[in-house]
Amino acid sequence: MTIASQHDLRRQFRALLESNTCYDAASVFDPMSARIAGDLKFEVGILGGSVAALQVLAAPDYALITLSEFVEQATRIGRVACLPIIADADHGYGNAINAMRTVAELERAGVAALTLEDTLLPPKYGHKTTDLIPLDEAVGKIRAALEARIDPQLSIIARTNAEQLSVEETIGRAKAYQAAGADGICMIGIRDFEHLEAIAPHLDAPLMLITYGNPKLNDMARLAENGVRIVVNGHAAYFAAIKATYDRLREQRGVGPSDLSAKELCIKYSTLDEYRVFAREFMNVQE
């Protein structure tokens, strides 16, 4: 992909943010899935951090994938993508200075946008996996990320966890990220429209929601009315691919069908239970 075409895809993404429509992001995890999503006329795709960890490392979402590994996968996708790609940049792979490097590398990889979250990652000793960093530290990361980008069309989206915060705290964080210059606000943990409508009217930036297919938020027109421009309904395509691979290999091996769900397969083959034991035993981490 040329620099010019990268710039064009970033402009396309900004047009989505500036529209009055809510778009359903395709979960992409490799070049083939990105090409399929583009052929099916999805307006935007997302490379999730959890999916990247599964695809690249066969590991759970424990902040194990490195920046280099994530960027390599984003670069592979960027070479063939004909739709804007959002990169889930987790916590920026460190502090504000690390986040600057993350932005630089992902910009070169060709992504149209990236999300930076305020979760305390990797989890610290004795902390919960959902703990957040202090607000001033999170604001510093957003400011640093904006400073690091070269193409002004690259969108920097600040992400927070509404499930861990009160409505007032969520609004406060989102407003602070807006004031720092974030191009959009991404929220996870919105329970339903009542929850969303208590927050959205207080914000000016375009919104992105990660809903994991929550049926209580399954109304694209109503999402759009509340300023939501991008919705991520989870990574069903990836899980379906894992399930199909498992079932086909079982059939080829002659061992018959399995009752294991896609989620159960990902837990099993990412050895998630083993990592949970390690986290409890060595770090006193509580999920």
Swiss-Prot record:
Keyword annotations of the record:
Decarboxylase, Lyase, Magnesium, Metal-binding
What is the stated purpose of this protein? Catalyzes the decarboxylation of oxaloacetate into pyruvate. Seems to play a role in maintaining cellular concentrations of bicarbonate and pyruvate.
Give the molecular function GO annotations: magnesium ion binding; methylisocitrate lyase activity; oxaloacetate decarboxylase activity
Q: Which family does it belong to?
A: Belongs to the isocitrate lyase family. Oxaloacetate decarboxylase subfamily.
Query: Where does the chain bind substrate?
Result: 50, 159, 235
The record's annotation in InterPro entries points to: ICL/PEPM, Oxaloacetate_deCOase_bac, Pyrv/PenolPyrv_kinase-like_dom, Pyrv_kinase-like_dom_sf
Q: What CDD domains does the entry give?
A: ICL_PEPM (cd00377)
Q: Which Gene3D superfamilies match?
A: Phosphoenolpyruvate-binding domains
- Which residue pairs form cystines in this protein? none
Q: Name one GO biological process term.
A: propionate catabolic process, 2-methylcitrate cycle
Out of the domains of life, which is the source?
Bacteria
- Which residues does the record give as Mg(2+) binding sites? 88
Cite the record's note on assembly: Homotetramer; dimer of dimers.
Q: Which Enzyme Commission numbers does its entry carry?
A: 4.1.1.112
Q: How is the cofactor bound?
A: Binds 1 Mg(2+) ion per subunit.
Cofactor dependence is on: Mg(2+)
- Quote the protein name from its UniProt record: Oxaloacetate decarboxylase
Q: Which reaction does it catalyse?
A: oxaloacetate + H(+) = pyruvate + CO2
Enzymatic class: lyase
